[in-house]
A protein has these predicted regions:
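Structured segments of extracytoplasmic/periplasmic soluble domains
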Residues: 3-11, 147, 177-181, 190, ...
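Alpha-helix N-cap and loop-to-helix initiation/capping positions
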Residues: 201-209, 244-251
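Conserved SGNH/GDSL esterase-like catalytic core that processes O-acyl groups on lipids
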Residues: 1-101, 105-208
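Catalytic His-Asp segment of secreted/periplasmic serine-dependent ester chemistry enzymes
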Residues: 171-172, 233-298
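Hydrophobic/aromatic beta-strand patches that form the interior of the parallel beta-sheet core
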Residues: 155, 227, 266-268
Length: 298
């Protein structure tokens, strides 16, 4: 994001879900929230697929629920302020929201019910923004954003534990409504670390499911190019206790290459870009370390 925004303009962290289990580990934005019931497609219970937004989540507020984003400048540049802040929701009843920019005065918004995705935008030099729900019966919230008015916007939809197949279940009308409000030029798919197994050879079902997911995205984002990234290297120990590339990884990469070819989208081999066989161990043991000691995550 930093490299692209320096080259082509733009600022801000982009789309952020209302709540996040990993907000404390995200260095690109300071994210605080309270008063929400959170639902994700990776939940084992109480998730209604028909309600989910573009990120595979939906959030139900209690009166007084809030979410705040604050820019930062310690991790990367161009993230300390933005020019436009937005919040995305869908209400079947009237909704009262208040917003506070840069710890200033509250500004109140009252919106009526709608059949589709709703958005409130605030413009200015925004270093922090706090949205508070004063009343929101029958309202689902999806996320908020900090963007520039021109240049690059990069939205990172991280969903821990997802194989990518859950993309098939996001309602097409919801994706199309998001596309009208945030039209993407490029969609990058990076999945598979949770799919690869030690001896996995047959990923036919995964291939079939991901092909369906890609066609779903093509239908809902017809203007967007799509790029599939392969899994990177993932190391495990053999019977002698020596680290080596997990055999199932290379099999999965062949399947991913076939998926890209069959669906007519671009493909980039991250395994080869990392250095190929055994490259994860080299990254882990580098000084300073460039990957996690699970020998899985960069």
């Amino acid at each position: 994001r930093e490299m692209l925004q320096k080259q082509f303009g733009g600022c801000g962290v982009g789309f952020v879900t209302i709540t996040s289990m990993t907000s404390g580990y995200r260095p690109t934005v300071r994210h605080t929230f309270g008063g929400w019931s959170s639902h994700a497609v990776t939940d084992s219970v109480y998730f209604d697929k028909k309600k989910q937004g573009i990120s595979g989540h939906y959030f139900v507020p209690r009166n007084g629920a809030y979410v705040e984003l604050r820019g930062q400048n310690k991790y990367a540049s161009l993230l300390d302020t933005c020019q436009r802040a937005s919040i995305f929701f869908h209400s079947r009843d009237s909704v009262l929201l208040s917003v506070r920019v840069n710890k200033g005065e509250n500004k109140n918004y009252s919106l009526g019910p709608s059949d589709g995705l709703q958005q409130i935008q605030v413009d200015g030099r925004i270093g922090s923004i706090r949205w508070t729900v004063d009343r929101a019966d029958s309202t689902l919230f999806y996320g908020l954003a900090m963007d520039g008015k021109k240049g690059i916007i990069l939205d990172n939809f991280s969903l821990r534990g997802s194989s990518g197949l859950s993309l098939r279940g996001i309602p097409p009308q919801m994706l199309k409504q998001f596309n009208r409000q945030r039209p993407y030029d490029l969609i990058i798919l990076e999945y598979g670390l949770n799919v690869a197994t030690e001896r996995g050879r047959n990923y036919d079902n995964y291939q079939k499911g991901l092909l369906t997911a890609i066609e779903h995205l093509k239908e809902c984002f017809p203007q967007a190019g799509i790029l599939l990234l392969s899994v990177g290297d993932r190391d495990s120990k053999n019977e002698n206790g020596e680290l080596r590339t997990m055999p199932g990884v290379k099999n999965l990469i062949r399947y991913q290459q076939n998926i890209a070819a069959e669906s007519g989208i671009a493909f980039w081999n991250m395994f080869e870009a990392m250095g190929g066989e055994g490259s994860m161990a080299k990254l882990v043991h580098a000084k300073p370390s460039m990957a996690n000691y699970d020998y899985t995550h960069i």
